[in-house]
């Protein structure tokens, strides 16, 4: 009887002979076949050779026959590897899938040439956005430089001339820029505060009159360490720089294929409802709108992804401002679960990357609190001003307006409706804007409230509540009073 070991050895020898005969037959058939092998076979063989080379450094199972065949065909394997690498390198680029794309590709996926033209056109538009934003940054830098010259307590005659020249250049550039915008974009012209020599001189006079080298002993903020009153001038100068730095493109909707300004109003109305549902801070709402506008200034978005942009912006803003922010599951639920959690997280990373991690836009609330010092923090005035301030996020004319100017205008019109008196020099000092600069803004804010239930329904319903002093109803009562007198 044959031993178990000898029988196993004979079976192994028989198996080796069969494998050797099969491999020789395959090699002979390949050499006798005319022409070159197909591309798919090259792919498969090259993948096998690549895998064998990678596993060579980390052997797990020793296959003697496979290694022998691999060494026999080492020269042909290297050629196959080069062919495979060339084909795959031209075929796809894995780096394009690192970030989720919120743009909607309106073209056929099979038409590669049309897709390339679409990408080239998108790159050109994005470069145009960058150039336009750089022009706006230079204009805002000129404004901030002029303000720094004015706010300096030790202004010399030479510095006055420098500020004067800067203002004249600013006026010329602003006029030419506005004319270009009207000629290119037609009707949509954003609102900006007016600047001229008379306004500059008035501001200089008020600042020199009310600026002090020592803290006011009668000011309660002097004794509150959390208010850091000794640093307030430097803090608000820096906030003015940030509001200019993070200004969105006021005409970004002209480059959006699927979106319109009316759609933005619908999205903001939904954001207001979600914001009120979670009882978040006012700063979170304004920061959300700024993220949306800045993101849309740099990327094209399809209508199917538009709500995702608003939800993700609210999610990021809540993380930045709130102590207890809503979870991603709650935000997804408020979006009717139209997007998965994974889509939310990918879109969040993508939006932060597009915003270049610049999330510290100041918003109007800090400026509104600063202005409230001029009337001893009158509660009714500030509450009504919050209503006027919040309706600005619905109007496309205020997309690129400075939040400090919007806060001053909301406070100004609130004092008029409540009969609190004129816009005093102290208000000019704390706001940085004169009455002449705020009158056009106040007219637009008041006009937007005439059809409040249509223009800003969610905000109107929100400010009907008692905790907001029924501010929206008060404004409607003011209109009825005006109509009855006329």
From Swiss-Prot:
Protein name, entry field: G2/mitotic-specific cyclin-4
Family per similarity comment: Belongs to the cyclin family. Cyclin AB subfamily.
Gene for this chain: CLB4
Region named Disordered: 1-80, 105-126
Composition skew (Polar residues), residue ranges: 25-41
Keywords carried by this UniProt record: Cell cycle, Cell division, Coiled coil, Cyclin, Mitosis
UniProt source species: Candida albicans (strain SC5314 / ATCC MYA-2876)
Domain Cyclin N-terminal: residue ranges: 234-359
GO CC, any one term: cytoplasm
């Amino acid at each position: 009887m044959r031993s178990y070991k000898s029988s196993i050895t004979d079976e192994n020898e028989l198996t080796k002979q069969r494998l050797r005969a099969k491999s020789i037959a395959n090699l002979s058939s390949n050499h006798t076949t005319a022409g070159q092998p197909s591309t798919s076979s090259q792919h498969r063989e090259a993948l096998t050779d690549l895998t064998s080379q990678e596993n060579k450094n980390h052997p797990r199972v020793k296959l003697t026959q496979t290694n022998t065949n691999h060494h026999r065909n080492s020269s042909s394997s290297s050629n196959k590897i080069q062919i495979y690498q060339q084909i795959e390198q031209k075929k796809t680029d894995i780096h394009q899938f690192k970030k989720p794309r919120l743009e909607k590709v309106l073209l056929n996926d099979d038409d590669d040439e049309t897709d390339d033209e679409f990408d080239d056109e998108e790159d050109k538009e994005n470069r145009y956005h960058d150039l336009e934003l750089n022009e706006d940054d230079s204009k805002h830098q000129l404004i901030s430089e002029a303000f720094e010259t004015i706010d300096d307590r030790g202004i010399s005659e030479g510095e006055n001339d420098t500020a004067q020249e800067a203002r004249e250049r600013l006026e010329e550039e602003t006029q030419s820029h506005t004319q270009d915008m009207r000629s290119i974009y037609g009707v949509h012209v954003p609102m900006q505060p007016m600047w001229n020599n008379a306004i500059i001189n008035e501001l200089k006079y008020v600042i020199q009159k009310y600026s002090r080298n020592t803290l006011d002993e009668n000011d309660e903020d002097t004794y509150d360490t959390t208010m850091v009153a000794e640093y307030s001038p430097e803090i608000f100068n820096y906030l003015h720089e940030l509001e200019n730095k993070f200004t969105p493109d006021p005409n970004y909707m002209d480059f959006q294929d699927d979106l319109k300004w009316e759609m933005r109003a619908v999205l903001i109305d939904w954001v207001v409802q979600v914001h009120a549902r979670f009882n978040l801070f006012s700063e979170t709402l304004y920061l959300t709108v700024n993220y949306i506008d800045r993101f849309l200034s740099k990327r094209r978005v399809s209508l199917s992804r538009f709500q995702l942009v608003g939800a993700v912006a609210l999610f990021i803003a809540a993380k930045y401002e709130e102590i207890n922010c809503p979870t991603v599951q709650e935000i997804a639920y408020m979006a009717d679960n139209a997007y998965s959690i994974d889509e939310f997280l990918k879109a969040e990373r993508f939006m932060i990357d597009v915003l270049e991690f610049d999330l510290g836009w100041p918003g109007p609330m800090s400026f509104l609190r600063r202005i409230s010092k001029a009337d001893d923090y009158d509660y009714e005035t500030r509450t009504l001003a919050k209503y006027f301030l919040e309706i600005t996020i619905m109007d496309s004319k205020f997309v690129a307006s400075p939040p400090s100017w919007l806060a001053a205008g909301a406070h100004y019109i609130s004092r008029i409706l409540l009969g609190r008196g004129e816009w005093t020099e102290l208000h000019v000092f704390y706001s940085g804007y004169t009455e002449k600069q705020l009158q056009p803004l106040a007219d637009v804010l008041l006009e937007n409230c005439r059809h409040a239930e249509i223009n800003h329904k969610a905000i109107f319903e929100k400010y009907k509540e008692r905790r907001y002093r029924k501010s929206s109803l008060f404004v409607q009562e003011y209109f009825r009073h005006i109509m009855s007198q006329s």
